[in-house]
Structure formats: C-alpha cells, structure tokens
Amino acid sequence: MNAQTERLTLSGPAGAIEAVRDSAALAAGAAPRGVAIIAHPHPLFGGTLDNKVVQTLARAFVQCGWTTVRFNFRGVGATEGVHDDGRGELQDLLAVAQQAAPEGPLALAGFSFGAFVTSHAVEALWAPRQMDKIVLVGTAASRFTVAPVPADAHLRTLVLHGEEDDTVPLAAVMDWARPQTLPVTVVPGGGHFFHGQLPLLKNLVVRHLQSGR
C-alpha cells in the first residue's frame, strides 16, 4: 500500500492545530472513500498523532481508500493551547472535522482518551451529519464519562479492546457497552497498546471498514 503524507496547520478554538493528512495512492480518476479523523491517547501521558495505535488505524483506513487526518490535541506538539480534560479537546476535534472534512463521507476513530473524545464528537455530530464508520479502541471508560453510541450507529461502529488491558480494564468497557447492547470485539491477551498485535488490530479494522453498514 502506498500513501502520501502531508503536514497541515488548521485553525482551532485555542489556536493553531498541528495535523497530518495521509492519502491513499488511487488510480487516475478515482476518488477517496471519504475522510477519517483519528484522535490520539492522553496528552499528559505522551499521546500524540504519531502514537503507534493511531498510525495503525490510519493505515487501515488508507488501505480501504479513505483519506485520514491525524492531529495533535491542544498543548501537544505544535498545537497551541493547554490540556482541558476533554472539553477543549472535543472542540479541537470538531474544528478539525469541519475544516478537513466539510462535506462528503466522514469517519471518526480514536484510541484511549481519543476514543472518549471521539464518542462525544459522534454524539455532537450524529444528528446533523451521520458518520459512515466509527472505530473506538481501548476506550477510556474507567477514567472518563464516555458518551453512548447512538442506537442507529451501532452497525457502523467497531469497539475494540484488549482482554488484558491494565490501563482501562475490559470490565469498564463492558459496563459502558452493556446498557447499550453494543458489541465489543475483544483481542485475546491484548494489552492497552496492543504490543505484538498491531497487525491483528489493523486487520480487524480493515474488516469492519470493508463491511456494509
């Protein structure tokens, strides 16, 4: 798979937002399937747009013909502002979506803290603009109040979690998903960062992206 990478500077509520756009090398005349916005893990614990899980998600989307935009939340890298416990970060994500994907098919994905922020972006955007695909990995349900996934978005949503995640226990994600009857795909033996299992993670995401709604 060949991909083209471009660095972007977008405008956010706290100032400039550093972002990277990864595009699939498409045949002449072919259009991308849409734009996928991918959110990184907790900024105060080293989370950036270059996180390995985030990059794996981007590769999966690009393989399936999507253009992806990974970005740094406020206070990370060259993105201006300071950490805001998810409130400002939600506004960052919404600003990125508005500028990088103003129209056409949209997908949202996030890892850990990024999955928490993504859940609230889905909640905010679903009524005016339904996403084609949603991917939540290592969702930080034990540390933050994760928004429920809209019922009519369940078939478009993939929730992935490691069986042996010691950062966000699997039980916390099951407790969040159970009232929604939202399926959770569990990676046997998987930890929070899916060490040694990133190829499997990618394949599971690709399978989801290739499935119907």
Predicted regions and their residues:
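Serine-hydrolase catalytic machinery in alpha/beta-hydrolase-like enzymes
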Residues: 10-12, 16-103
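Active-site nucleophile loop of the alpha/beta-hydrolase fold
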Residues: 41-42, 134-144, 190
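Short beta-strand immediately N-terminal to the catalytic nucleophile in serine-hydrolase-like folds
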Residues: 108-110, 137
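Gly/Ala-rich beta-loop-alpha elbow adjacent to hydrolase catalytic centers
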Residues: 110-118
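Acidic catalytic loop of the alpha/beta-hydrolase fold
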Residues: 142-143, 163-168, 192-193
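Short beta-strand/loop motif that positions the catalytic acidic residue
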Residues: 153-161, 165
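Conserved loop-alpha-helix segment in the C-terminal half of the alpha/beta-hydrolase fold
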Residues: 163-182
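Catalytic histidine-centered segment of alpha/beta-hydrolase-like enzymes
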Residues: 190-202
